[in-house]
């Protein structure tokens, strides 16, 4: 157990400060003494311990482990400093990093830093420095793009070059970049090229044709909007395809105006097309991409300006030159704005023509008239003048007002027989009178008694001017009355509006009226205020913004779930009402299909069948006394002049 351990060494080997040395404990096994070279002596009493270390570092007395740790720490610190010097940017270059590496939008939100350099690229495509000298680049650095010379560090930018296929200097063409690592940079560059593509095509178009593309077209924001006329400009078309498109496009179009030019990208085909049917932008894009064999993003597709004289003159003038090929009939919007004859025919807007249009089409709503008349601008000169006017709202309001006046006067001078004939002439279908008779029999109503009451009702005989249809719910009371009201063009009044002074105003513009679903409160109101209305005598009706109107109340139909003849509180209404009871549920042949259909055609046939029984004037008598249904004309006719 007491074998001698350790390594023999001289004192000179252990005292050299510049090299490695061995310090070992020398133990005398007999006396168990520790060598004086050892730092700690457990047998010492502590009286001669020196608490202040006055040793000079590096005198050769350090512990080897501590020295080794210091050397490792120094090496790590040197390595970290080298990395920081290489990768960490200084405060002076922080602005350049943000401009080149990040989006300009991120730099725009900074409050302290203002950059004066022009920003044309969002990402720097330079790969990370490998540390082995300069790296040859294929894409220009941001210093080259912005036009600034490399003034930081005093080193010029070397070995940087850019290769493009088209020579136009834009980002839409293919850019060859070295395989420097990630796919993210490549996808971002593809996105940038796509965003700049349209601007590049517009610039090239103006350079080739000498006119802006949007000066000839109007923009459709939606690609689903259909139009028959389209302006297409395709870039990068092969020569053989550009020559063959003149024949390939003919089966799809009625008119084509084609121009073909040559540029550094290839052939450019510029076309004005009128398709056989209306198409949207997506359909046109797919069609032209298939015919021209080019990507859809290499085309500009918009509809032409239809009311622009300069645009029409451009198409007219270029069609006369030898640089264009045209086939088909020239569109009317070009002819209208270019030919002398059509220019002389342009006239100012005439309100009477618009009023006649509203009268002929029975339009009494301003919004409907404005929409319908504006659609005639391509075929009607007065409608085109209406669209060119700055007073469209005033014209529409005046035309509807005049149409209502004419309609009201025409209705007032017609008798009930003439009015039924007038309304029946508007129905072109052939109907059957039997469903009406069968429905009345289904409800237990005698047809003869109904005809007798209906004859007095149409004549407006006093005390017989109101018919009440009484019965439980879902028996067809409203269905029967509404169908008759629609055929005769009547008006509906509602007790819900009885708080207004003008709730009876619709009766002044109709030949027949309907009060649907009268409640006990409604019958009490009628018994209090509207007895003369049920009599058929002249009454005074208040109208909004107008003076009181005195007129004879038109025949009035009332539907109700309450029998007013059985209530003693309404005993004064019994002599003024003619009551018919509907007790049976409304019959259906199938869900949603009535067993006895009652429509305008059936009512027309019913009146024709029972014309004599209702004691209506025959059409022959009307012709003898003068036909009051002569078409109204507020526009003077054209005089035919012989040559």
Curated annotation (Swiss-Prot):
Biased composition (Acidic residues): 36-51
One BP term from GO: DNA replication
Keyword Magnesium: no
Post-translational modification Phosphoserine, affected residues: 90, 103
Chain residue ranges for the region called DNA-binding region: 180-346
Enzyme Commission identifier(s): 5.6.2.4
Position(s), cross-link Glycyl lysine isopeptide (Lys-Gly) (interchain with G-Cter in SUMO): 552
Record keywords, A-Z: ATP-binding, DNA replication, DNA-binding, Early protein, Helicase, Host nucleus, Hydrolase, Isomerase, Isopeptide bond, Nucleotide-binding, Phosphoprotein, Ubl conjugation
Post-translation changes: Phosphorylated. Sumoylated.
Reactions it catalyzes: Couples ATP hydrolysis with the unwinding of duplex DNA by translocating in the 3'-5' direction; ATP + H2O = ADP + phosphate + H(+)
Disordered as annotated region, ranges: 30-58, 119-181
GO cellular component terms, A-Z: host cell nucleus
The protein's name in its UniProt record: Replication protein E1
Chain ranges for the short sequence motif Nuclear export signal as given in the UniProt record: 102-111
Family, similarity comment: Belongs to the papillomaviridae E1 protein family.
InterPro entries hit by this protein: Helicase_SF3_DNA-vir, P-loop_NTPase, PPV_DNA_helicase_E1_C, PPV_DNA_helicase_E1_N, PPV_E1_DBD, PPV_E1_DBD_sf, Rep_E1_papillomaV, Znf_lg_T-Ag_D1_dom_sf
Domain of life of the organism encoding this protein: Viruses
Subunit structure: Can form hexamers. Interacts with E2 protein; this interaction increases E1 DNA binding specificity. Interacts with host DNA polymerase subunit POLA2. Interacts with host single stranded DNA-binding protein RPA1. Interacts with host TOP1; this interaction stimulates the enzymatic activity of TOP1.
Renumbered ranges of motif Nuclear localization signal: 84-86
Binding residues for ATP: 471-478
Transmembrane region(s): none
Subcellular location as annotated: Host nucleus
Biased composition regions of type Basic and acidic residues, renumbered to the chain: 155-167
Role played: ATP-dependent DNA 3'-5' helicase required for initiation of viral DNA replication. It forms a complex with the viral E2 protein. The E1-E2 complex binds to the replication origin which contains binding sites for both proteins. During the initial step, a dimer of E1 interacts with a dimer of protein E2 leading to a complex that binds the viral origin of replication with high specificity. Then, a second dimer of E1 displaces the E2 dimer in an ATP-dependent manner to form the E1 tetramer.
Pfam families assigned: PPV_E1_C, PPV_E1_DBD, PPV_E1_N
